[in-house]
Amino acid sequence: MENLHFQSIDQVDDISTIDEYHVAKNAGLNEKEALSCISRYSRDNARTPVQWNDSANAGFTSGNPWLPLNPNYKEINVASQENDPNSLFSFYKELIALRKNPEYKETVVYGELIPYLEEQHNLMSYYRKGDKTLLVLGNFQKEPQTVKLPSACHKVLLNNYPELNISDDSVILDNYQAVVIEL
């Protein structure tokens, strides 16, 4: 699901978001700018009805939801992602399967978390060290990003893209690509 872009402050339920809206307005932002600011950080984003399917009220309720539905619920919903191997839902299932895999469970669940390349902009990167060493990388920008590998890759465990551009000493992550690599 994506965040709901509020069209009016009347759609907002969270009191702290309403307060932030008024702070933004008092600082000189117009209504559209203030709504844009609060839409990004509002706690109501996590409180909107779950988009189960493309039926009325996204399959969430037969009544009136307390918050508005995201208008994209016909395209983005659980039912549309359940059988799509490239969906975010499927990627989460793969993450959970990795966590439960007896070969990696000790490292994923109990391994030491060690930051890696903390200064590289828009990159999430860290090790999980236990009986194995895993490197988790996430590119959080629109452009590809080259990441130096500390050692050769033994195995790519997870990848949210069909391909990975990897060599012995670096990996090129596409925009918003996330991988888990065993070193």
Summary of predicted features, one role per range:
Residues 150-162:
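Solvent-exposed beta-hairpin/edge-strand motifs
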Residues 45, 159, 166:
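Residue-level signal for pocket-adjacent positions within structured domains
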Residues 137:
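Short hydrophobic beta-strand that contains or immediately precedes a catalytic carboxylate
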Residues 129-130, 161, 183:
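Short, flexible beta-strand-to-coil junctions
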Residues 167-183:
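C-terminal beta-strand-rich structural cap/linker in extracellular carbohydrate-active enzymes
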Residues 113-117, 164-166, 171:
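Short, exposed beta-strand/loop patches in secreted or surface proteins that constitute
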Residues 1-134, 142-144:
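Loop/helix patches that line or flank the sugar-binding groove of alpha-linked glycan CAZymes
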Residues 140-152:
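Surface-exposed beta-strand/loop patches in extracellular or lumenal glycoproteins
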